[in-house]
């Protein structure tokens, strides 16, 4: 090993401010990951719907019970909100809008919440079978948890959203 020490050596920064550049890259990645999360949530909803239509209890499909309908409807609402916010992020990304940080954080937060919610509800609708390895519910749950931590926690993205809105004097 060698150690090099510079003392009173002239230095010149290369490139732009590193932190701003890193946040811009994370904003771009957040928009792309949001679409992956929306896609995963859609599959979880479809799996839950198909199972609810096929599974019968007390002589009728469990999809006919109001509690199951409400769960499926709640999943659908969260997914559509996440999709809309992801499109907003994609729009901001496509034109390099000044509001990219707001759009990316909005897409990230809503898509993470939608995917986590849909993957959990999918397991619940599958009942005991949702906890087994026979169905792929666990794969979507684990992927939702992994993507929730990619690029930072949900708390961090919510804080970024608040800071971005404060900078715009919206909050």
Model-derived features with residue positions:
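Short helix/loop capping segments that flank catalytic or ligand/cofactor-binding pockets
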Residues: 13-15, 42
């Amino acid at each position: 090993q060698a150690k090099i020490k510079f003392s009173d050596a002239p230095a010149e920064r290369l490139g732009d401010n590193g932190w701003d550049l890193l946040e811009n890259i994370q904003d771009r990645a957040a928009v792309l990951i949001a679409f992956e999360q929306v896609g995963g949530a859609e599959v979880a909803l479809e799996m839950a719907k198909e199972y609810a239509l096929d599974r019968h209890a007390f002589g009728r499909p469990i999809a006919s019970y109001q509690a199951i309908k409400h769960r499926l409807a709640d999943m659908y609402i969260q997914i559509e909100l996440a999709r809309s916010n992801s499109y907003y992020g994609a729009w901001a990304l496509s034109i390099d809008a000044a509001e990219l940080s707001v759009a990316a954080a909005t897409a990230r937060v809503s898509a993470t919440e939608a995917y986590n919610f849909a993957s959990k509800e999918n397991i619940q609708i599958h009942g005991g079978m949702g906890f087994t390895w026979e169905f792929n519910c666990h794969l979507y749950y684990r992927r939702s948890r992994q993507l929730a931590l990619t690029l930072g926690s949900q708390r961090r993205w919510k804080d970024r959203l608040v800071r971005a809105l404060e900078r715009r004097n919206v909050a």
